[in-house]
Amino acid sequence: MISIMMKVSLAVFMLAGGIIKVSRVPFQVEHWRHYQYPLWFLTVTGILEIAGALAMTAGIWNRYAAIGAGVLFVVLMAGAIHAHMFRARQSVIMAIQAMICLIVSIMIIMGSYT
């Protein structure tokens, strides 16, 4: 039950983030410029987040989908942490959401092997 709640929570969070990126909401575009990434990468990242959210939802029934989505999210969240802390030189506080998603993704991956 906890595993399902973690998967659903992570999927909803990532889906929302993906939609915000693909829609190019002004505050997200501003953040992306601050990270000094090209705007096409914003769209690609959003599409990957949406695809991962769908795969994580499928992961409720298929552990391989959960593992694949978890690995994708680990890569994306490592990139998000890097963007906040090193590219934009923000404090650790700005990267907390990405760190939580990274930890939850790792927990889902590890839990899928049992």
Swiss-Prot record:
Q: Where is this gene product found?
A: Cell membrane
What transmembrane ranges does the database entry give? 38-60, 64-86, 91-113
Supply the alphabetized keyword list.
Answer: Cell membrane, Membrane, Transmembrane, Transmembrane helix
Please tell me one Gene Ontology term that the record gives under cellular component: plasma membrane
- Pfam families, alphabetized: DoxX_2
For whether the record's keyword set contains Magnesium, the answer is: no
- Membrane topology reported for the UniProt record: Multi-pass membrane protein
Specify the superkingdom: Bacteria
Q: What is this protein called?
A: Uncharacterized protein YdgD
